A protein has these predicted regions:
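Acidic, glycine/proline-rich low-complexity segments that act as flexible tails and inter-domain linkers
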Residues: 2-3, 15-30, 167-172
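N-terminal interaction modules that seed assembly of large macromolecular complexes
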Residues: 32-69
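Short secondary-structure subsegments characteristic of cysteine-rich extracellular domains
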Residues: 63-85
Length: 172
């Protein structure tokens, strides 16, 4: 029996969703990109998963370790087989100025692949129910939990303070 994917084609055909728009707005704020990329490079944290945890926290939904592990399973194959190879290819071209045009095209494909990854997480969000609807700060809780799961650690302080601060800001 073939296991059905946790998303359907309709979800993937509509990657411009609330989560994607949140990510574009938040990621562009001061310090957020550097913070997220540092967590990715030093600790293997998936930036889209980190943004997902912050976004779902804006809806007062708190995630537990099992929720984050389930979300990770939704995207791990796509991230490993598509997003990361594109990222590696783009980074390899950085040193060669003659590759600037090709590098720009690869970067555009990488962003599209990340948008599809976010569409998978967005579709998954409908299945998540808050583990603790009364948690004081769902954004900080979820972001810290995401980093803790990725690093197999327990964090007592905010792992990504710029992201948490940016996610708390209302749309302008």
């Amino acid at each position: 029996m073939v296991e059905q994917a946790p998303y359907n084609d309709q979800d993937l055909l509509q990657p411009d969703n609330d989560f994607w728009r949140f990510s574009l707005r938040v990621y562009d704020q001061e310090g957020v990109a550097n913070e997220c990329l540092e967590l990715q490079e030093l600790h293997g944290v998936n930036v889209n998963l980190l943004l997902f945890c912050a976004w779902i926290g804006t809806q007062s939904i708190t995630l537990d370790r099992n929720d984050i592990e389930a979300a990770t399973q939704i995207v791990v194959h796509w991230d490993t087989m598509v997003v990361r190879p594109l990222r590696i290819a783009r980074q390899e071209m950085k040193a060669d100025p003659d590759m600037a045009t090709v590098r720009a095209r690869v970067k555009a494909l990488e962003i599209e692949a990340e948008q599809i990854e976010q569409a998978m997480l967005f579709a998954h969000a409908r299945r998540i129910r808050s583990a603790d609807a009364h948690h004081g700060d769902a954004i900080a809780h979820n972001v810290n939990q995401c980093v803790a799961v990725a690093t197999n650690a327990v964090l007592s302080e905010a792992a990504a303070p710029c992201l948490i601060k940016a996610a708390r800001r209302k749309k302008s």
